[in-house]
C-alpha cells in the first residue's frame, strides 16, 4: 500500500520499474509499426494556428533547420516542468515546453499552483535526484533524522504513509530544526533479499553511487516531482484549441485534484492517451482548407548570451518562492524579477534558449495562480494562509490575458 491510498491497489512491473516497463513496451510497439514516423532530436518551438485551430507544429531539427509538421490532430505529450527547480526528480527535458507553446497559442492552462514535491529523492553529492519510490515506505521503510530519531509519528497518525505534501513539509521542518540537508530512509525492517527483489532498480542505482541500501539507510530530501496543473483538457483530451489534444503530465483534466496519489500519473497517461485515440477513431477530423501562412508565436525576452546564468537564477528563484512553502511577499518580488523584457531581435533557433523562454513563461503563470489562491490546499501551501478555505473549492483557469474561477467539480468540455 502506498501513501494516502486507502488500500493496496497499485500494480507493479519488474519490481520498482513500472514506468520503465511501460515505456519499453510502448517503444517496442511504436518501432515495430511501419505507419509511424519517428523524428528524433527535434525541438518543437511553436504550434501552427489559424482560422480552424491547430494545424500542426513548427520544429527545429538537430542542425537548427526549421521543420513544419502538419497534422489533422496534434497531441501534446511533452511531460512536466520540474526543471524550473534546482532539485527535481524530472529528466532534463522536463522544461514545460508543451504548456508554454500551447499557452502562447491562446490555449488555457489550469491548476498551475499545484506542483507536487516528492518527499524522498536520493540526496548524494554526486548523484541526480533519483526518485526513491513511495513503495519503499509502504513496505516498511522508516524516516529518521541523522541522529536516528523516527519523527513522522509525531506529525501524523499515518506516519510515513501520510499524504506526500504532509510528509514533505514534515521533512522540511525537521531539516530546518537541525540545519541538515537530508534525512534518512531506514530499510532495516526488510531483509537484503526482500530489498533486492522488491526494489532492484533502487538497489542497483544506489550501488552505482557507492551506497549499499541492504546495509545503510538512504539519504533523502524533498524534490520537485509532478505538475498537477497543465493544459486544461476535457475527458477526451481536447484542449481549448480545435484539433489540439494533450495527455499525461502536460495536461490537466482535474483527476489528481490538489494532491496526486502515488502511481496515478502512469494511469492518467494510459487512460487519456487511449481516450484520445478512441475519440479520433470516432471523429474523422479535417480542415476545409490549409492556410498558405500560419500564425506562429516565438518568445525572445532574454539575452541569448546569458542563457546559463539566467537559467540558474530562474531555478533558484522558483525553488525559493514556488517551493514547498510559499508566501505573498516572496511571490510578488519574484513576479517583478521575471517581468518580460522583449528584444526586437529574432529569437535564435537554439533549443536551450527556447527552453529558457518556456520556463520563464510557466514560472510567471505559476506565480500568478499561486498568488490568487489565498489558502493552503494539498500541495499548495502558503505560510500566510496556512488553512484550507471551503470558499476556495475552485479551479483557477489561466487564459493568456485573464484568470477565471470555476467550481472544483467542473469538468472541462471543449466543444469544437
Q: What does each of the following model-derived ranges do?
A:
Residues 17, 66, 85-93, 127-131, ...:
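Alpha-helix capping and helix-loop boundary segments enriched in small/acidic/polar residues
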Residues 90-103, 109:
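Thiamine diphosphate
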Residues 46-68, 211-253:
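FAD-site-proximal beta/loop scaffold in flavoenzymes
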Residues 1-65, 70, 77, 121-124:
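Conserved redox-cofactor binding core of oxidoreductases
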Residues 33-37, 41, 109, 182, ...:
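Flexible, glycine/charged-enriched surface loops at secondary-structure junctions
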Residues 1-7, 144-156, 160, 171-174, ...:
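Glycine- and aromatic-enriched mobile tails/lids
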Residues 71-73, 77-82, 250:
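Glycine-/small-residue-rich beta->alpha transition segments that form the dinucleotide
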Residues 101, 107-218, 269, 279-285:
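An anion/pyrophosphate-binding glycine-rich loop and adjacent beta-alpha core
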Amino acid at each position: 500500500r502506498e501513501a494516502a491510498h486507502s488500500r493496496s491497489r497499485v500494480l507493479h512491473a519488474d519490481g520498482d520499474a513500472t514506468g520503465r516497463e511501460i515505456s519499453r513496451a510502448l517503444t517496442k510497439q511504436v518501432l515495430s509499426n511501419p505507419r509511424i514516423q519517428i523524428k528524433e532530436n527535434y525541438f518543437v518551438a511553436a504550434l501552427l494556428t489559424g482560422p480552424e485551430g491547430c494545424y500542426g507544429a513548427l520544429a527545429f531539427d538537430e542542425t537548427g533547420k526549421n521543420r513544419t509538421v502538419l497534422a489533422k490532430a496534434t497531441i501534446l505529450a511533452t511531460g512536466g516542468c520540474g526543471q524550473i527547480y534546482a532539485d527535481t526528480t524530472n529528466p532534463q527535458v522536463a522544461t514545460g515546453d508543451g504548456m508554454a507553446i500551447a499557452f502562447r497559442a491562446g490555449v488555457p492552462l489550469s491548476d498551475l499552483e499545484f506542483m507536487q514535491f516528492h518527499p524522498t529523492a536520493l540526496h548524494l553529492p554526486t548523484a541526480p535526484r533519483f526518485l526513491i519510490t513511495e513503495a519503499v515506505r509502504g513496505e516498511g521503510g522508516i524516516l529518521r533524522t541523522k541522529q536516528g530519531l523516527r519523527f513522522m509519528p509525531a506529525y501524523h497518525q499515518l506516519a510515513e504513509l501520510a499524504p506526500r505534501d504532509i510528509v514533505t513539509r514534515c521533512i522540511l521542518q525537521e531539516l530546518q530544526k537541525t540545519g541538515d540537508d537530508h534525512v534518512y530512509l531506514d530499510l532495516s525492517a526488510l531483509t537484503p533479499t526482500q530489498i533486492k527483489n522488491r526494489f532492484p532498480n533502487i538497489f542497483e542505482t544506489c550501488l552505482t553511487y557507492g551506497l549499499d541500501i541492504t546495509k545503510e539507510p538512504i539519504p533523502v530530501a524533498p524534490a520537485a516531482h509532478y505538475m498537477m496543473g497543465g493544459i486544461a483538457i476535457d475527458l477526451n483530451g481536447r484542449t481549448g484549441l480545435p484539433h489540439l489534444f494533450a495527455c499525461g503530465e502536460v495536461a490537466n483534466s482535474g483527476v489528481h485534484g490538489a494532491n496526486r496519489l502515488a502511481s496515478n500519473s502512469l494511469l492518467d497517461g494510459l487512460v487519456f492517451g487511449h481516450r484520445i485515440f478512441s475519440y479520433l477513431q470516432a471523429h474523422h477530423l479535417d480542415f476545409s482548407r490549409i492556410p498558405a501562412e500560419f500564425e506562429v508565436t516565438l518568445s525572445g525576452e532574454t539575452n541569448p548570451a546569458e542563457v546559463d546564468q539566467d537559467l540558474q537564477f530562474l531555478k533558484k528563484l522558483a525553488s525559493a518562492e514556488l517551493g514547498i512553502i510559499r508566501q505573498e511577499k516572496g511571490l510578488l518580488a519574484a513576479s517583478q524579477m521575471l517581468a518580460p523584457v522583449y528584444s526586437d531581435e529574432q529569437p535564435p533557433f537554439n533549443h536551450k534558449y527556447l527552453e529558457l523562454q518556456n520556463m520563464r513563461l510557466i514560472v510567471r503563470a505559476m506565480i500568478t495562480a499561486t498568488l490568487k489562491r489565498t489558502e493552503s490546499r494539498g500541495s499548495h501551501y502558503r505560510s500566510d494562509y496556512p488553512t484550507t478555505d471551503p470558499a476556495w473549492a475552485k479551479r483557477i483557469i489561466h487564459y493568456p490575458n485573464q484568470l477565471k474561477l470555476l467550481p472544483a467539480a467542473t469538468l472541462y468540455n471543449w466543444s469544437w
